Structures are given as structure tokens and as C-alpha cells.
């Protein structure tokens, strides 16, 4: 994929890519990719999910950074356009987070939102 990050509908931060790279190295499976997806549920109607996947399905968007890939299915992508996948470590623990400008409201847990 091009290095023109302004054209990407979803940003994959350096911190997230670095953590994915470390986790994939721990799993000893270089075919793994971080998949971000949205499902119905949570206290605000939708929730974010993350999983490692070794498959890329038809229609998936792939963003590569630091030699690792973030994969998003087309249905989830429509809710994530303009957002970013990041990784943070703090007093609350460490986790992947989504910054989503399309979310009209979010829940205190940070993984649930409404549009």
C-alpha cells in the first residue's frame, strides 16, 4: 500500500504497529495480521473487536506498517472511516484503542459506541 497516509480511510499508528509486530513475533507466525471489526452489542449499540487472523478475505482493506498488517472488513470500515487504531499503556492497563470521529457517543468502557 502507498505511503500516502492522508489517502488512507483508517490510520494505523506507529505504537499499534509496533505492538502488533511484537505480538506476532511472540506467536512465531509471520502470517498473522491484526483484524479490527465492529459488531452489534455493548452498552452503546456497537463495539470494537480485535483478533489476529492469518486470512485476508475478499473486500478486506489492508494497511501495512513496520512490516505488519491491519485488516478491516468492508462492513466495519464504513463505521471507521477517518479513525485510527492505536495502542496505549497506562494505569488502566494496555490495550488497542480506536479513535472514531463517526461515533456520536461512547461508553465509559471505551469499546462501545453509537453512530
UniProtKB/Swiss-Prot annotation:
**What are the alphabetically sorted keywords of the record?**
Iron, Iron-sulfur, Metal-binding
| One of the GO biological process terms | iron-sulfur cluster assembly
Q: How is the cofactor bound?
A: Binds 1 iron-sulfur cluster per subunit.
InterPro entries per the UniProt record, alphabetical: FeS_biogenesis, FeS_cluster_insertion, FeS_cluster_insertion_CS, FeS_cluster_insertion_RrpA, HesB-like_dom_sf
**Keyword check for Iron-sulfur:** yes
Give the binding site residues for iron-sulfur cluster. 43, 107, 109
Q: Which HAMAP family match?
A: Fe_S_insert_ErpA
Know the name of this protein? Iron-sulfur cluster insertion protein ErpA
Q: Which organism is it from?
A: Pectobacterium atrosepticum (strain SCRI 1043 / ATCC BAA-672) (Erwinia carotovora subsp. atroseptica)
Q: Which gene encodes it?
A: erpA
Amino acid at each position: 500500500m502507498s505511503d500516502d497516509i492522508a489517502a488512507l480511510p483508517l490510520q494505523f499508528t506507529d505504537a499499534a504497529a509496533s505492538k502488533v509486530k511484537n505480538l506476532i513475533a511472540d506467536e512465531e507466525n509471520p502470517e498473522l495480521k491484526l483484524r479490527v471489526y465492529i459488531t452489534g452489542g455493548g452498552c452503546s449499540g456497537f463495539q470494537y473487536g480485535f483478533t489476529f487472523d492469518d486470512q485476508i478475505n475478499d473486500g478486506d482493506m489492508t494497511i501495512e506498517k513496520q512490516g505488519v498488517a491491519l485488516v478491516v472488513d468492508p462492513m466495519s470500515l464504513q463505521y471507521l472511516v477517518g479513525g485510527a487504531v492505536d495502542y496505549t499503556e497506562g494505569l488502566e492497563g494496555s490495550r488497542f484503542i480506536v479513535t472514531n470521529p463517526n461515533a456520536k457517543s461512547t461508553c465509559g468502557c471505551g469499546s462501545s459506541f453509537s453512530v
